[in-house]
């Protein structure tokens, strides 16, 4: 799925979790990346920092319907009885039941109920009720969810269509074109990553001037190149124009339709929709961001959002608390350079309070894999003494018993050092980032070795 080149630095970090983002943004590197189509224009692919909001399929489909885009008839059901009612109302001889989870690979997933597959075709309202009862309230396990799985709280019940042809269509932002780009392919209904790898020439791109907007001629030209029959090229282009309007209206970073089809009646339909929204637009897209399903997120991500912290949990054992995304990335890099593995990305921003620093420590220490913590602060806008007070408060309140290495530089750093020195806590201070990284890696290794030898080692604070 998906072909947005802008998964950015934060989303690149997310891939370190050993599972891929829900939309296959990794495909972008193949479709639009170093050896992909964009380089045919002599342009260097660049990245921007952003974090995307993903909505459930049924929510995305409702937005499409609102925009006048053609979609199959259907409705969300939050209980087996509702699934029965929707299937009966549709009146089709067969309907499709789709589990609503924010993870890819659902078709090949397995529910904790034992049901195989998150997309099922049923042939009666009674069967719709029976199948949905094995989905709703159950966890679905896919390659992307890992062993934790994702809870399915509702299903999408929709009419079954019999497509003559399937196509792929997407809109994303492409920095090297300085605006949006349409992406199309005659090979829809399959994994776009496979298409990009095996037949990259099957991927067609159409840049859009951000000031002029999409022209009907551009949409018509793309529809023709994608292979839509002449009698429905106009209809396909109309849907593309409506999707582009939706893309702009809601500050989307990606809209992916896979597949867009010509059905047995000759109509153009969008059978599936994945839409990502730029979190930077939350202040003006309240309608969209109120739809976020926190049951699909890590509990720590929810806590981080409530504390206004930028947090992404990873698979390592060294907790990181840093101000600024760039410095956070550099901190993680230098930890890796010295043989360590970061347990998280955590940017407290430039205006963090003592409360936020305490909440940041709560987030870090809620991960039982964390064996040591590195705090790396450069005080520009941020005042180092505020961070220091937060560290002292957190260590006392949370009774943290793992080693904490602190590197502070910048505004009011002397006050911060005095505060830490006078706290009576055993906080390991370093002026040099390289030295701090070496130290925290060594400390994590000591604790790891002790655990492997079944030796109980604790770093008592204070000593």
UniProtKB/Swiss-Prot annotation:
Its EC number is 6.2.1.5. It is found in: Mitochondrion. The modification N6-acetyllysine is found at residues 78, 88, 129, 139, 143, 216, 368. The keyword ATP-binding applies. It comes from the Eukaryota. GO terms for molecular function: ATP binding; magnesium ion binding; succinate-CoA ligase (ADP-forming) activity. ATP binds at residues 98, 105-107. Its main location: mitochondrion. It catalyses: succinate + ATP + CoA = succinyl-CoA + ADP + phosphate. GO terms for biological process: succinyl-CoA metabolic process; tricarboxylic acid cycle. NCBIfam families: PRK00696.1, sucCoAbeta. This is Succinate--CoA ligase [ADP-forming] subunit beta, mitochondrial. The lineage of its organism: Eukaryota, Metazoa, Chordata, Craniata, Vertebrata.
């Amino acid at each position: 799925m998906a072909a947005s080149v802008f998964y950015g630095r934060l989303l690149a970090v997310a891939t370190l979790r050993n599972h891929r983002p829900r939309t296959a943004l990794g495909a972008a590197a193949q479709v639009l990346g170093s050896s992909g189509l964009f380089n045919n224009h002599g342009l260097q692919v660049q990245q921007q920092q952003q974090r995307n909001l993903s909505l459930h399929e049924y929510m995305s489909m409702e937005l499409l319907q609102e925009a006048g885009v053609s979609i199959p008839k259907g409705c969300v059901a939050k209980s087996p009885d509702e699934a029965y009612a929707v299937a009966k109302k549709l009146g089709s001889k067969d309907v499709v039941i789709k589990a609503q989870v924010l993870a890819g690979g659902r078709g090949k997933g397995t529910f904790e109920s034992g049901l195989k597959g998150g997309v099922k075709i049923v042939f009666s309202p009674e069967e719709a009720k029976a199948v949905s009862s094995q989905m709703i309230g159950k966890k679905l396990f896919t390659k992307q969810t890992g062993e934790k799985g994702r809870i399915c709280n509702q299903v999408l019940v929709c009419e079954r269509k019999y497509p003559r042809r399937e196509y792929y269509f997407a809109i994303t932002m492409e920095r090297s074109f300085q605006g949006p780009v349409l992406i199309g392919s005659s090979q829809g209904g399959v994994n776009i990553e496979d298409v990009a790898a095996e037949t990259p020439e099957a991927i067609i791109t159409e840049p859009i001037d951000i000031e002029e907007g999409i022209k009907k001629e551009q949409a018509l030209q793309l529809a023709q190149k994608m292979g839509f029959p002449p009698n429905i090229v106009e209809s396909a282009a109309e849907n593309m124009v409506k999707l582009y309007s939706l893309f702009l209206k809601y500050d989307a970073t990606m809209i992916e339709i896979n597949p867009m089809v010509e059905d047995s009646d000759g109509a153009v339909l969008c059978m599936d929709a994945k839409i990502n929204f730029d979190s930077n637009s939350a202040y003006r897209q309240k309608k969209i961001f109120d739809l976020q399903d926190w049951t699909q997120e890590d509990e720590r991500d929810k806590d981080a959002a409530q504390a206004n912290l930028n947090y992404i949990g990873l698979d390592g054992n060294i907790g990181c608390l840093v101000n600024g995304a760039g410095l956070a990335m550099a901190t993680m890099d230098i930890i890796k350079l010295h043989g360590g593995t970061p347990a998280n990305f955590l940017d407290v921003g430039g205006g963090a309070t003592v409360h936020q620093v305490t909440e940041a420590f709560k987030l870090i220490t809620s991960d039982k894999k964390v064996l040591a913590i590195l705090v790396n602060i450069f005080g520009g806008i941020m005042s180092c003494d505020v961070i220091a007070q937060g560290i002292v408060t957190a260590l006392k309140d949370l009774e943290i018993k793992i080693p904490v290495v602190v590197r502070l530089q910048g505004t009011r750093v002397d006050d911060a050092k005095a505060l830490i020195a006078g706290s009576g806590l055993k906080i390991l201070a370093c002026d040099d980032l390289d030295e701090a990284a070496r130290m925290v890696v060594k400390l994590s290794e000591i604790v790891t070795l002790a655990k492997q030898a079944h030796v109980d080692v604790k770093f008592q604070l204070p000593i």
